[in-house]
Curated annotation (Swiss-Prot):
GO terms for cellular component: cytoplasm; microtubule. Its cofactor is Mg(2+). Belongs to the tubulin family. It comes from Pneumocystis carinii. This is Tubulin alpha chain. Tubulin is the major constituent of microtubules, a cylinder consisting of laterally associated linear protofilaments composed of alpha- and beta-tubulin heterodimers. Microtubules grow by the addition of GTP-tubulin dimers to the microtubule end, where a stabilizing cap forms. Below the cap, tubulin dimers are in GDP-bound state, owing to GTPase activity of alpha-tubulin. GTP binds at Q11, E71, S140, G144, T145, T179, N206, N228. It catalyses: GTP + H2O = GDP + phosphate + H(+).
Length: 449
């Protein structure tokens, strides 16, 4: 089997994890205590979910996941919540003191004490797999545990499991909505550390998802639960073909092969459609062409940036539900003819398709309407560089005054690491700029040198 281990780091990682496992259980017919639901036991078993769940001797299903946070509050809610019997208690790992929004605490001081214990648990879960495919790491860029411990974990995973895929789902600091003052520091330090260790990083930003909840789903004041359930649908779409059968399956390695033209440029933009509330669902057709076009609307993106300002390098369209391949091909060819969507000239084909026959799962009392088909688009576009330059600008404003730096240095970090990280991100912005240039322009520039 091709198993995948999910690792949820910090508060954001844990809460997104809760939403994801709730959804996986509904999709596979697994009760909150880990047993199969009665209607599922009569049907022949689909083998697919053993990629995400392991079966115990007594016929219980246990998620192949590890939750880790440096302070206990958030994971305690999992230990006492609805799904407390689903998870293996030793795979919920908490420390005693939190990282206090400080990358250095998560990475150097507090995180160091916990990392070996966490790796030991991951090793046990990995030993239980017959053909481990890779890891999904969920964390935020802004928090101390998510940025610091998340980076430390990815570094150590590269050492222990060099060839396995490591995909990140990262909550990126939103342009307007901020949860901590030092987000720009944490984000740039963690990106610098993980740039060479992570194979592919799907970014979501809270503000973009707030806007989707308000605009498309008519939720006046979205809470984290609304946001996380939306993210869970996206994660489920990305992992659906690992868990269900379809005519075009996509595994973890295929994402990298098709989406990452150069190792550093591994931050695809995520878009999902249809995003409609139950009230509007009856008036929408949701044809394949409609939902495919909706993916190219900036309003449906999970990160605030405008793809019309950049060029697409590669695009991966993952359909699920009632899909006929012929419709998909028509929709894609009509998009190719549109002049508004620009591809870089060195990547003429640009589309990777995945089709999975399992329709999107409706979550009871959820925000999204029940639909019979959906699509998730992962696109590597040069416009995501906007997100980096926004962040770099905020970093520069604070760092020019050396504001808050003493908190990091006090935890054993060198001040030089700040400037090193900032230079690395400047290089990343430059990489995006160069990739977007036409190949003829590039040749002329090389000749000038």
């Amino acid at each position: 089997m091709r198993e995948v281990i999910s690792i949820h780091v910090g508060q954001a990682g844990t809460q997104i994890g809760n939403a994801c496992w709730e959804l996986y259980c509904l999709e596979h017919g697994i009760e909150p205590d880990g047993r199969l639901s009665p209607e599922k036991t009569t049907k022949p078993l689909d083998d697919g979910f053993s990629t995400f769940f392991s079966e115990t001797g007594s016929g219980k299903y246990v998620p192949r996941s590890i939750y880790v946070d440096l302070e206990p509050n958030v994971i305690d809610q999992v230990r006492t919540g609805t799904y407390r019997h689903l998870f293996h208690p030793e795979q919920l790992i908490t420390g005693k003191e939190d990282a206090a929004n400080n990358y250095a605490r998560g990475h150097y001081t507090v995180g160091k004490e916990l990392i070996d214990h966490v790796l030991d648990r991951i090793r046990r879960v990995a030993d239980n797999c017959t053909g481990l495919q890779g890891f999904l790491v969920f964390h935020s860029f802004g928090g101390g545990t998510g940025s610091g411990f998340g980076a430390l974990l990815l570094e150590r995973l590269s050492v222990d499991y060099g060839k396995k895929s490591k995909l990140e789902f990262s909550v990126y600091p939103a342009p307007q909505v901020s949860t901590s003052v030092v987000e720009p520091y944490n984000s740039i330090l963690t990106t610098h550390t993980t740039l060479e260790h992570s194979d592919c990083s799907f970014m979501v930003d809270n503000e973009a998802i707030y806007d989707i909840c308000r605009r498309n789903l008519d939720i006046e004041r979205p809470g984290y639960e609304n946001l996380n359930r939306l993210i869970a649908q996206v994660v489920s779409s990305i992992t659906a073909s690992l868990r269900f059968d379809g005519s075009l399956n996509v595994d973890l390695n295929e994402f990298q092969t098709n989406l990452v033209p150069y190792p550093r440029i591994h931050f695809p933009l995520v878009t999902y459609a249809p995003l409609i509330s139950a009230a509007k669902a009856h008036h929408e057709a949701n044809s394949v062409a409609e939902i495919t076009n909706a993916c190219f609307e900036p309003n449906n993106q999970m990160v605030k940036c405008d793809p019309r300002n950049g060029k697409y390098m590669a695009t991966c369209l993952l359909y699920r539900g009632d899909i006929v391949t012929k419709d998909v091909n028509c929709a894609v060819s009509s998009i190719r003819t549109k002049r508004t969507i620009q591809f870089v000239d060195w990547c003429p084909t640009g589309f990777k398709l995945g089709v999975c026959y399992q329709p999107p799962q409706y979550v009871p009392n959820g925000d999204l309407a029940k639909v019979n088909r959906a699509v998730c688009m992962l696109s590597n576009t040069t416009s995501i560089a906007e997100a980096w330059s926004r962040l770099d600008h905020k970093f520069d404003l604070m760092y020019s005054k050396r504001a808050f730096v003493h908190w990091y240095v006090g935890e054993g970090m060198e001040e030089g690491e700040f400037s090193e990280a900032r230079e690395d991100l400047a290089a990343l912005e430059k990489d995006y700029e160069e990739v977007g240039q036409d190949s003829i322009e590039g040749e002329i520039m090389e000749e000038e040198y």
